[in-house]
């Protein structure tokens, strides 16, 4: 077998609040790299505090790409991400730099590194119909429906993951073909790079939960609710008939803040709901990450030396 001549890239993956941003910046500084965000919330302008978007000081330490691409009333698909990220990575490599892919959106990573199956575009009317059904019957009932038409998808998609349940049923109702079958079809080619996948996750789940809670409290102190109030006050957002159906507003934390500002519950309940939703997101992310069999796992707080060794070995090949 010949030597693999593909350019190198490093993927910094992990659940929310696991320290990906700090690690990505450190690697970019060490390896003369540039960071490519792989996060579906960070593509939206005005979603800064609640998305833990790198701030000006962090961006000054290393170039960042694919932040602030869309307004929050717009949409951005995995296919658009794969095309944009591919162009950015090719440009970074052409300039002799190291691409550092950093984020926690599994669909974006799969689209970029494994290729993307052809798939029908999102249909706002169908999504609204499914959301109305869910409001009446509950997402568990729609998950049971998915299990009847696409058992493989229902096994992969947790009953508490409404966004993916909605997408799977949307694809089936639009085309009559299960999403699992669509995913088997050849589509967009994967990015031609050799990638070291680093997964950051505390060994103790309780530590991650503590980090999630502390980070959310810090976001509140930084003015997260004022950020959401400003979003709601934008004329373009006010004109949206069902803002809770927008991908930007469905982002964890933002949905709970939006509902709270709509008058649902008190401040303590809002905080509890947002922290719970973030923990559920982390759980789903860890489930996806366990399927990344070619990745290496590190606790960012105690495995720094081992992580540095893995990176050194990879770039020296």
Swiss-Prot record:
Native organism: Stenotrophomonas maltophilia (strain R551-3)
EC number: 2.5.1.75
Upper classification of the organism: Bacteria, Pseudomonadati, Pseudomonadota, Gammaproteobacteria, Lysobacterales
Cross-referenced InterPro entries: Dimethylallyltransferase, IPT, P-loop_NTPase
PANTHER family per UniProt: TRNA DIMETHYLALLYLTRANSFERASE
GO molecular function: ATP binding; tRNA dimethylallyltransferase activity
Positions of the UniProt region annotated as Interaction with substrate tRNA: 39-42, 163-167
Quaternary structure, from the entry: Monomer.
Protein task: Catalyzes the transfer of a dimethylallyl group onto the adenine at position 37 in tRNAs that read codons beginning with uridine, leading to the formation of N6-(dimethylallyl)adenosine (i(6)A).
Any Pfam family the entry gives: IPPT
Gene Ontology biological process terms, A to Z: tRNA modification
Entry keyword DNA repair: no
Positions contributing to ATP binding: 14-21
UniProt protein name: tRNA dimethylallyltransferase
Cofactor(s) the protein needs: Mg(2+)
NCBIfam families recorded: miaA
Superkingdom of origin organism: Bacteria
Binding-site residues, substrate: 16-21
Reactions performed catalytically: adenosine(37) in tRNA + dimethylallyl diphosphate = N(6)-dimethylallyladenosine(37) in tRNA + diphosphate
Assigned protein family: Belongs to the IPP transferase family.
